[in-house]
Amino acid sequence: MKKQALTIIFLLVSLVTGIQAKENDHWYLGTKMGWSDFNILEYRSKDITPFDTKIDTKNPLGAPVFGLFLGYEFNPYFSFEIENDTTGFSPHLIFQKNEQNIQINSLQLATKLSYPITDDFHIYTQLGGMMFWDNLSFKKDLQNIFTEKSRLIPNVSLGAEYIFNKKFITRLDYTWKSNIAKIMNLSMKPVLGDVALSFGWKFGKSNINEIFSSYIPQSSDKQYVALNENINFPFNSTELKPISHDKLQKLQKEIKNIKSKNIFIMLSGHADRIGNKEYNQKLSENRAYSIKNYFTSHGISQDKISIQGMGNEFSLTNQICKDVSDRPLLISCLAPDRRVEIEVLSD
């Protein structure tokens, strides 16, 4: 079991190393710690080679659970995760050869459906399935995976997460697990249940302006503006809001419907007047790169996209906000200035 756990850790680390080389910032890796009401002694006593036949399995017991997970975020609403959990895990005994650990490993695949309350705080649910590694090694269990005798354990999680600095993830969730037989009999009483606190890290390059080099395509005098859109940003941020993803998705479909092959996209980033000029110039450029990053990740060639940072030179709120002195009110008033203007040019 120790070799199995170490093998899983090695595979996850290998995946992270390979993914980082591709400079993709949609991946995340994490660990979780918590408590499961899974009676590991009862599970073992029913095994082919039980640890101890004298164990009293009638008394309900729980066990600590430790897990490692790797996930890919397709967008702020949808992710996919693979997870290995070890129930009964004792970190201080794992490398002690003379100690007999009572523990069991399981593999879980799940989709994660999130709803952003704010840019940093999300609530989510996970829908997936879990199998113990012991069952995965038996051909009969694999053949019965979609029958009433299946060892597959469907699960549902409910939780909340907070993301610090756009990189570090903390989350708390409860996972409800039941077997196929109980679900088919419409029983809602779970076979297993885990409460866990998780910590994760989104990796890949965070400075999106380093991902793409600035390139300004040659434009034709006969070009005209086919489409335009404004995308707004939170204060002092380059992160896209959930509503911005919806607007960009719609714009992307409209771009693909343009019959002309000679299409160029001009992205003009803007900042509000709070802060010094140099900082706002860089912030406006990074916002434009954020939109460029979205378009290129959805199949639009970066050669067709040009960006420019306008700093805080072209405010939309000069007259409206000139007499506002209270900082929170001023931040709210200047919201229209924190934007990227998108112009789609076609011949």
Curated annotation (Swiss-Prot):
<dbReference type="InterPro" id="IPR036737">
    <property type="entry name" value="OmpA-like_sf"/>
</dbReference>
<feature type="transmembrane region" description="Beta stranded">
    <location>
        <begin position="168"/>
        <end position="175"/>
    </location>
</feature>
<dbReference type="InterPro" id="IPR050330">
    <property type="entry name" value="Bact_OuterMem_StrucFunc"/>
</dbReference>
<feature type="transmembrane region" description="Beta stranded">
    <location>
        <begin position="78"/>
        <end position="86"/>
    </location>
</feature>
<comment type="subunit">
    <text>Monomer and homodimer.</text>
</comment>
<keyword id="KW-0812">Transmembrane</keyword>
<dbReference type="GO" id="GO:0015288">
    <property type="term" value="F:porin activity"/>
</dbReference>
<dbReference type="GO" id="GO:0034220">
    <property type="term" value="P:monoatomic ion transmembrane transport"/>
</dbReference>
<keyword id="KW-0998">Cell outer membrane</keyword>
<feature type="transmembrane region" description="Beta stranded">
    <location>
        <begin position="105"/>
        <end position="116"/>
    </location>
</feature>
<dbReference type="InterPro" id="IPR006664">
    <property type="entry name" value="OMP_bac"/>
</dbReference>
<feature type="transmembrane region" description="Beta stranded">
    <location>
        <begin position="194"/>
        <end position="202"/>
    </location>
</feature>
<feature type="site" description="Part of salt bridge gating mechanism">
    <location>
        <position position="171"/>
    </location>
</feature>
<keyword id="KW-0406">Ion transport</keyword>
<dbReference type="InterPro" id="IPR000498">
    <property type="entry name" value="OmpA-like_TM_dom"/>
</dbReference>
<feature type="transmembrane region" description="Beta stranded">
    <location>
        <begin position="26"/>
        <end position="36"/>
    </location>
</feature>
<keyword id="KW-0626">Porin</keyword>
<feature type="transmembrane region" description="Beta stranded">
    <location>
        <begin position="121"/>
        <end position="129"/>
    </location>
</feature>
<keyword id="KW-1015">Disulfide bond</keyword>
<feature type="transmembrane region" description="Beta stranded">
    <location>
        <begin position="154"/>
        <end position="163"/>
    </location>
</feature>
<dbReference type="Pfam" id="PF00691">
    <property type="entry name" value="OmpA"/>
</dbReference>
<dbReference type="GO" id="GO:0009279">
    <property type="term" value="C:cell outer membrane"/>
</dbReference>
<comment type="similarity">
    <text>Belongs to the outer membrane OOP (TC 1.B.6) superfamily. OmpA family.</text>
</comment>
<protein>
    <recommendedName>
        <fullName>Outer membrane protein A</fullName>
    </recommendedName>
</protein>
<feature type="transmembrane region" description="Beta stranded">
    <location>
        <begin position="63"/>
        <end position="74"/>
    </location>
</feature>
<feature type="site" description="Part of salt bridge gating mechanism">
    <location>
        <position position="81"/>
    </location>
</feature>
<dbReference type="GO" id="GO:0046930">
    <property type="term" value="C:pore complex"/>
</dbReference>
<dbReference type="InterPro" id="IPR011250">
    <property type="entry name" value="OMP/PagP_b-brl"/>
</dbReference>
<feature type="domain" description="OmpA-like">
    <location>
        <begin position="220"/>
        <end position="347"/>
    </location>
</feature>
<feature type="region of interest" description="Hinge-like">
    <location>
        <begin position="207"/>
        <end position="218"/>
    </location>
</feature>
<dbReference type="InterPro" id="IPR002368">
    <property type="entry name" value="OmpA"/>
</dbReference>
<keyword id="KW-0732">Signal</keyword>
<keyword id="KW-0813">Transport</keyword>
<dbReference type="Pfam" id="PF01389">
    <property type="entry name" value="OmpA_membrane"/>
</dbReference>
<keyword id="KW-0472">Membrane</keyword>
<keyword id="KW-1134">Transmembrane beta strand</keyword>
<dbReference type="InterPro" id="IPR006690">
    <property type="entry name" value="OMPA-like_CS"/>
</dbReference>
<feature type="signal peptide">
    <location>
        <begin position="1"/>
        <end position="21"/>
    </location>
</feature>
<feature type="disulfide bond">
    <location>
        <begin position="321"/>
        <end position="333"/>
    </location>
</feature>
<comment type="function">
    <text>With TolR probably plays a role in maintaining the position of the peptidoglycan cell wall in the periplasm. Acts as a porin with low permeability that allows slow penetration of small solutes; an internal gate slows down solute passage.</text>
</comment>
<dbReference type="InterPro" id="IPR006665">
    <property type="entry name" value="OmpA-like"/>
</dbReference>
